[in-house]
């Protein structure tokens, strides 16, 4: 190997000569970390350890809802170590976004962007560990379309990251190589690192600041999947239709007013087949409030239908 090469390998050691592209890239990443770190705070919200948050708008911190275990006595550790009080403006479990208010006192606001990510794109996960910057380097492992969380929230794109995300960095920033905050990092199933895109965050922030909560459609019925044996019997009795079982009716709720009964099986929503509880949760988004829905049912082995006006309730 020629000594004129920019990277010289000695066993497991890599020596990078001054002026090499690799060294320039390393310096650029370090500069991005330094520049972004001033907009990231540590959030003390009652968990086993602090998480992170992003100064999204002036006086507004965005963090991961799932790690915020209390609604009051929330503290922030700002870059440099200063501690500030924060109050909860609202939380949305369906998108994993919580919004805090605080006195910024000159703390810079993150530069955010709604970026279209590609698999293989290099990104940084930025957090705050008791006032000190925390960073992880990796790539976008999966870039998919819109999806629905288990709580029924709409996430504008599915972004999975190939990087090691510290629990202390959850709720922190996903940063591109232009220094823009393009999402919030969270830990998903099997502790995989995911990102909530900035467009989803902006939508949640607008609603939380305006109303203090995220309101969703309200059916007023408790649903659960049918056991396999019962599902098979009901399917045979109703032409192989599947559905979800009604196990509770809220008094004076939309379903009660429409005449739904415990033991009914919901098989369709405006003609669309229903087989899982999650499908109903997805359909009860904010846009469903006030709408009239035709539900297909099985009652006593016979098919019937009900018309229900969807109500409104805040997400708990």
Identify the residue ranges that each predicted region occupies.
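Short loop/turn microsegments at loop-to-beta-strand junctions
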Residues: 49-51, 169-171, 244-247, 261-262, ...
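C-terminal cap/linker of serine protease catalytic domains
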Residues: 9-33, 125, 177, 181-241, ...
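Residue-level recognition of beta-strand microenvironments
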Residues: 58, 64, 89-91, 126, ...
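Conserved PDZ fold ligand-binding element
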Residues: 60-62, 182, 255-278
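Conserved active-site neighborhood of the chymotrypsin/trypsin-like protease fold
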Residues: 16-21, 42-134, 159, 167-168, ...
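Active-site region of chymotrypsin-like
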Residues: 37-39, 98, 102-111, 134-191, ...
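PDZ/PDZ-like domain micro-motif
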Residues: 168-174, 227-238, 250-268, 283
